[in-house]
Amino acid sequence: MPYIVRMFTVIETPTFVRLASNCWNDEDRTNFITFIAANPDAGDVVPGSGGLRKVRWGSAGRGKRGGVRVIYFNRLANGEIWLLLVYGKSMRENIPTHVLRQIKKEIKNA
C-alpha cells in the first residue's frame, strides 16, 4: 500500500519575511518551510489565540531551547499554512494573546 503525504502551501506574511531575515539564513528558512508544509500540526495551539500555533525550532549549535519560535495559522481546508511571526526565545518568551487574536482576525479577513 503506498504512503501518501499531503503537502500544504506555505504563505509567508511580509512581517514574517522581515523577521525571518533576522533569525535565519536562507537554508534554515527553507528547511523550516519544508518541515512545516509536511507537518502542519507540529506546534502547540496557543491558548486564547483563536487557533494560532507556536512551534519551537532549533538553531544550529543551540537546539530548540536556544532557537526560535514561529507563530503560524493553519487554513488546512484551503490547503494553506500562514507563517506570521518568528522570534528568538532570547528576545521574547511569549506574544500577548490579545496581539495574536488581532493577527488571526486580520488573516481571516484576508
Predicted regions and their residues:
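Short acidic alpha-helix initiation/capping motifs at coil-to-helix transition points
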Residues: F8-E12
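A short, surface-exposed loop/turn module that caps and links secondary-structure elements
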Residues: T34-K64
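Enriched for short, Lys/Arg-rich terminal
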Residues: N74-A110
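Short, intrinsically disordered or compositionally biased N-terminal tails of bacterial proteins
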Residues: M1-M7
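Short, surface-exposed coil-to-beta transition loops
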Residues: G66-V70
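Short polar/acidic secondary-structure junctions
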Residues: A60-R62, F73-L76
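Short, solvent-exposed recognition patches
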Residues: E27-F35
